[in-house]
Amino acid sequence: MILESVAEHLLFKNDINYQNVFSILSDILEKKIDYSDIYFQSIIHESWILENSIIKEGTYNINQGVGVRIVLGDKTSFSYSNDITFNSLISSSKLAMSILDVKAITKNVCPLTTTRTKPIYTSCNPLTSIDTQKKLEILNRINCVAKNYDHRVVSVNAELSSSYDEVLIATSDGNLAADIRPLIRLSINVLVNDKGKFERGVSGGGSRSGYSFFLNKHKSGKILAEYYACEAARIALINLSAQEAPSGTFPVVLGSGWPGVLLHEAVGHGLEGDFNRQGTSVFANKIGRQVASELCTIVDDGTLKDRRGSLTIDDEGTPGQYNILIKNGILKKYLQDKTNARLMEMDLTGNGRRESYAHLPLPRMTNTYMLSGPFNPKEIICSIDYGIYALNFSGGQVDITSGKFVFSTSEAYLIKQGKIGKSIKNVTLIGSGIDVMKEISMVGNDLKIDEGVGICVKNGQSIPVGVGQPTIKLNNLTVGGTI
């Protein structure tokens, strides 16, 4: 069982037992507080890097520790140590209590009750799932496939990485839960040159599984690693012949899958509980109101099998959930961690996430996507006389308070008379999340989740996430210059 395995590694081997953990929480609850938790973690990470056809770097590191958090009202004290021992646990708890400077009160900790949630991903260690030689063969194979894709490919860089993360959480409300989280990621960057003109293409994928995932067959007939290599080369070559994008206000079609990153940034962050409790989100105090086209239903789903953003439990011990955030255009709920849910008197959603034991949990997304609609993607393209088809994105920025965003594409095309035309580059999409959501007039029936490379940063904390959507049509969106 997961709990027993993790407890053996994180507690028992360090001469800590359940009663020790219970006693620390009991000591903390002698003070006038609302909540406390103890978060144990051990994570192993490796990375292999190929640069210019040579495997130049291999890294391996282990990081482990324990964090103690105490919450009173909207105030939090936190202390952590990279030494998992009973003495360091005592020291961390005393330091956390001294930071908050709370008064004594008689209060008993709830008996620790184990939370056993059915795992939604394997507990295998990806670092040992295949031997080192096979890992290097994957990188060399990527290099060979990309170089052979076209004579204009001049450089191939790739990174193959994985981690094996074990966590155990004990809480003052009596919850004891553990999780084992494998994670793999492959990123490929291809540079092409045609008579002194250079362009780049990026592709990749990942999963909560072992490295053999990259050896699975893609629908194209290639193994996934080869498919990603070809995709990176294809995108780079397309941009070689791409013309400059027009500027103005146009109908815009966003492709399925990774373009959901715009949804993640421009809408998802604005639905996180802390921003709404503080009144800094454009979506604050709008539950029950229409915030998007009635064609839009947006969910945050931590329960998708093997997906990068999925969580059997979040970093507060709450089981991962399927949350409908916006239904038929109506705002239904915010994403919550325990602190913000308590202060807002709302239900937990399984979105309390942290980068590591050395960080505080925050309300964060898992896999955020829009559900499919009734339209065939070809119908959507055919409905536009002149517009933009944005198929892949390279980056962007968003202001949570206003909801305004700026995004740049890595693959885009003109649409003329209902047909996809020439490729265009330096496409910048500018708008406001809440306004753009109301501009959606067609939603495709081709929902796709991204390939598994998403990384989200908030308050300096990086976590893995998933994004997705079907093909969608925006009636009007501003298209400008480069970021």
From Swiss-Prot:
Keywords for the protein's UniProt record, in alphabetical order: Hydrolase, Metalloprotease, Protease
InterPro entries: Metalloprtase-TldD/E_C, Metalloprtase-TldD/E_cen_dom, Metalloprtase-TldD/E_N, Peptidase_U62_metallo, TldD, TldD/PmbA_N, TldD/PmbA_sf
The UniProt record lists the keyword Hydrolase: yes
Highest taxon, organism lineage: Bacteria
GO CC annotations, alphabetized: cytosol
Catalytic activity, EC: 3.4.-.-
A family per Pfam: PmbA_TldD_1st
Biological processes per GO annotation: proteolysis
Keyword Metal-binding listed: no
A GO term, aspect molecular function: metallopeptidase activity
Similarity remark: Belongs to the peptidase U62 family.
Role description: Probable metalloprotease.
PANTHER family in alphabetical order: METALLOPROTEASE TLDD, UNCHARACTERIZED PROTEIN TLDD AND PMBA
Protein name: Metalloprotease TldD homolog
Organism whose genome encodes this protein: Buchnera aphidicola subsp. Baizongia pistaciae (strain Bp)
